[in-house]
């Protein structure tokens, strides 16, 4: 029998050593024990996979950029090598995302009780995130399917968070942040992205007195990120409008 506490301890240790693959493997084993995760365990799982997938997302972006430049050069051999390498990274990224999505569907979301709104929103947000990461590298029909799954997960989480969580709750705010990024980057819908981010920010500002001392830092950091995105996106839209006016 695997000792749950030992696995969690191993995950903490791996995090300190920045060995995120080991950390993810340990937390995957904890999740597969099929018992509800504590808040700390939930965060360990999230941090582990965020770093594992983050490394692949970063590599994919670098190689995609090189691929575009190489295509312009017209060196066939090099183009083929770069493409093959991008596809290798893509497969790794897809495997990681699928791992997380399986854990969410088979254990985490399934085991949320009727009143565990915070956990449910956390896991549905995570589901939206990992389908979004798949959408970043997918094309054609495959992309359409993962985009739809991402939207569905974010939307369900959003409804639950609005009904059961304070506007200043860091999980509700984090969901709004990522959902708005989904609209902006994946759906290419800047108006929806700005509306969602602005509403979340304004609602939180209006209820600043409900800020929990424990999560004050987290909440205010996410509010700052929402505001930064809004500033960037609205200036981008103005630039686009200006550009169109000049054509």
Curated annotation (Swiss-Prot):
Keyword Hydrolase among UniProt keywords: no
Subcellular location: Cytoplasm
Gene3D superfamilies the UniProt entry points to: 14-3-3 domain (1.20.190.20)
Designated name of the protein: 14-3-3 protein gamma-1
Assembly description: Homodimer, and heterodimer with other family members.
Site description Interaction with phosphoserine on interacting protein, residues in chain: 57, 132
SMART domains (alphabetical): 14_3_3
Assigned protein family: Belongs to the 14-3-3 family.
Any one of the GO CC terms: cytoplasm
Broad class of the protein's primary localization: cytoplasm
One GO BP annotation of this record: heart development
GO molecular function list: phosphorylation-dependent protein binding; protein kinase C binding; protein sequestering activity
Listed InterPro entries: 14-3-3, 14-3-3_CS, 14-3-3_dom_sf, 14-3-3_domain
Gene from which the chain derives: ywhag1
PROSITE patterns to which the protein is assigned, alphabetical: 1433_1, 1433_2
Pfam families the UniProt entry points to: 14-3-3
